[in-house]
Regions:
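Active-site proximal beta-strand in glycosyltransferases
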Residues: 8, 96, 112-132
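N-terminal strand-loop element at the rim of the active site
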Residues: 14-18, 34-79
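Short N-terminal targeting/anchoring amphipathic segment
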Residues: 87-107, 118-123
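A short, histidine- and acid-enriched strand-loop-helix "catalytic/donor-clamping" loop
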Residues: 16-17, 105-106, 122-140
């Protein structure tokens, strides 16, 4: 594979062992399964499943967990999670950042700002989030995200 991006950090709100996040979990797992032998993936995700109040019990916290063809870091909620993201992205041991969503403050907007400050390349995979139906749900929040992006010069 003639890819110059061999080390990729992926952000997704939910991942295995969770299942409540549905399709995005399967999409990211399939990406890792199909291309993980050629690309070194590091996934940053939540330490709990969608809607759960307690973290997973079968993961190691504050360190990378090998899961299939990727290393996964499960971040904690609140300010501690933002600090963890900042520390992980500051390491700069990656070529590219892949954001699996656009409308997540923790897993898209914040990493996008940090990546811009660090001059890192970014790929956005919004997975249908800009469809008319999707935009009508929680529309005020999405309107703010869309309006803030060009004002912060985050599009390049």
């Amino acid at each position: 594979m003639g890819n110059s991006f061999t080390n990729v950090v992926v952000f997704s709100g939910f991942y295995l062992p969770g299942y409540k996040g549905g399709g995005p979990i399967k999409t990211i797992k399939n990406l890792f399964d199909e291309t993980g032998k050629d690309i070194n993936y590091k996934l940053i995700t939540s330490d709990r499943d969608l809607g759960d109040k307690v973290p997973y019990t079968n993961i190691r916290f504050n360190e990378w967990n090998k899961l299939g063809n990727a290393n996964v870091f499960y971040i904690q909620p609140g300010l501690k999670g933002y600090k963890q993201i900042l520390q992980l992205l500051s390491c700069k041991d990656y070529d590219l950042i892949y954001l699996n969503s656009f409308f997540s403050l923790r897993f898209s907007f914040f990493p996008l700002i940090i990546a811009k400050l660090l001059h890192k390349k970014i790929i956005l995979g919004p997975r249908g989030e800009f469809s008319t139906g999707a935009l009508s749900l929680k529309s005020f929040k999405k309107y703010l995200f869309i309006r803030m992006q060009p004002k912060l010069n985050l599009q390049n």
